Amino acid sequence: MSAVCGGAARMLRTPGRHGYAAEFSPYLPGRLACATAQHYGIAGCGTLLILDPDEAGLRLFRSFDWNDGLFDVTWSENNEHVLITCSGDGSLQLWDTAKAAGPLQVYKEHAQEVYSVDWSQTRGEQLVVSGSWDQTVKLWDPTVGKSLCTFRGHESIIYSTIWSPHIPGCFASASGDQTLRIWDVKAAGVRIVIPAHQAEILSCDWCKYNENLLVTGAVDCSLRGWDLRNVRQPVFELLGHTYAIRRVKFSPFHASVLASCSYDFTVRFWNFSKPDSLLETVEHHTEFTCGLDFSLQSPTQVADCSWDETIKIYDPACLTIPA
């Protein structure tokens, strides 16, 4: 693997590994985890890459191999060294970056590929949710070797599961059944079902500044905002992508700014509160762009990864000026 620092972008090439997900550490500035797969995730192995910035661009701190493609990654909220990945063999893997050995624990219950995993952000609880092609969401306590609960209701692949950063025990899921669903761990069931698109929904995220606001990204190339107090119509719709939207993320620094990446090879930045909502289009990949994250420490820094075998950290121009 080779690092390049070109212009404002720091880049790491990952030969033979296609990027699926990227997430900045909530603790260490600049540290990035990236979940990758061989052969575009269709066959072969996977590798978890832990990267740090250096003078040359990006430095590989550690890598962990798994015997199937890795599709998502999430950092622990109470231990800076610990993170979880999920894979095509239906399992989740718990890793410790302070150790070069294999996973500390493997959780194998899903019957098909696990496409999404997220660690709860409210410090009072340490829970993980995973979403699978088997149409279920599972709830895990990482200290326990088996799931605590299984949530059923989706009628197709679950592509995205993400905890509310505001409400303990509440998470959202997005599915190929065209719905966004809000779940309550305490009730062990679904609270709200939103028919959000007339197409598969590949991603969702919560606004960091409004506990009632979520965004969905779908195969219909649209982003839609949803206010949980009234879900009959979206509160905003953002158009511009020309192929399916693979991932969407709200900014942790700006209440109305979000980013999306797509199978059209681009990353786009938006401010849904402005009439001209598209702030910037970044075109620096040559394949599907699947992973995307905002830095939690730097208001201007973003990371993405692509099937073109590159990982990039950069500062888009639109984030260096007031949104």
Swiss-Prot record:
Q: Which GO terms describe its biological process?
A: endochondral ossification; ether lipid biosynthetic process; fatty acid beta-oxidation; neuron migration; peroxisome organization; protein import into peroxisome matrix; protein targeting to peroxisome
Recorded family membership: Belongs to the WD repeat peroxin-7 family.
| Keywords per UniProt | Cataract, Cytoplasm, Deafness, Disease variant, Ichthyosis, Peroxisome, Peroxisome biogenesis disorder, Protein transport, Repeat, Retinitis pigmentosa, Rhizomelic chondrodysplasia punctata, Transport, WD repeat
Which locations, inside or outside the cell, does it occupy? Cytoplasm, Cytosol; Peroxisome matrix
Q: Which tissues does it occur in?
A: Ubiquitous. Highest expression in pancreas, skeletal muscle and heart.
Top-rank taxon of the source lineage equals Eukaryota
- Where is this protein primarily located? cytoplasm
GO cellular component labels: cytosol; peroxisomal matrix; peroxisomal membrane; peroxisome
Q: Which InterPro entries does the entry mention?
A: G-protein_beta_WD-40_rep, PEX7, WD40/YVTN_repeat-like_dom_sf, WD40_repeat_CS, WD40_repeat_dom_sf, WD40_rpt
Q: Which GO terms describe its molecular function?
A: enzyme binding; peroxisome matrix targeting signal-2 binding; protein homodimerization activity
State whether it acts alone or in a complex, and with which partners, per the record: Interacts with PEX5; interaction only takes place when PEX7 is associated with cargo proteins. Interacts with VWA8.
Family annotation (SMART domains): WD40 (SM00320)
Origin organism lineage: Eukaryota, Metazoa, Chordata, Craniata, Vertebrata
Stretches forming WD repeats: 65-96, 109-141, 153-184, 196-227, 240-271, 284-315
State which disorder the record connects to this protein.
Peroxisome biogenesis disorder complementation group 11: A peroxisomal disorder arising from a failure of protein import into the peroxisomal membrane or matrix. The peroxisome biogenesis disorders (PBD group) are genetically heterogeneous with at least 14 distinct genetic groups as concluded from complementation studies. Include disorders are: Zellweger syndrome (ZWS), neonatal adrenoleukodystrophy (NALD), infantile Refsum disease (IRD), and classical rhizomelic chondrodysplasia punctata (RCDP). Rhizomelic chondrodysplasia punctata 1: A peroxisome biogenesis disorder. It is characterized by severely disturbed endochondral bone formation, rhizomelic shortening of femur and humerus, vertebral disorders, dwarfism, cataract, cutaneous lesions, facial dysmorphism, and severe intellectual disability with spasticity.
Function text: Receptor required for the peroxisomal import of proteins containing a C-terminal PTS2-type peroxisomal targeting signal. Specifically binds to cargo proteins containing a PTS2 peroxisomal targeting signal in the cytosol. Cargo protein-binding triggers interaction with PEX5 and formation of a ternary complex composed of PEX5 and PEX7 along with PTS2-containing cargo proteins, which is tranlocated into peroxisomes by passing through the PEX13-PEX14 docking complex.
Q: What is the effect of changing residue 287 to R?
A: Impaired interaction with PEX5, leading to decreased peroxisomal import of proteins containing a PTS2 peroxisomal targeting signal
Q: Which residues cross the membrane?
A: none
Q: What is the effect of changing residue 217 to R?
A: In RCDP1; uncertain significance
Protein name per the record: Peroxisomal targeting signal 2 receptor
Organism of origin is: Homo sapiens (Human)
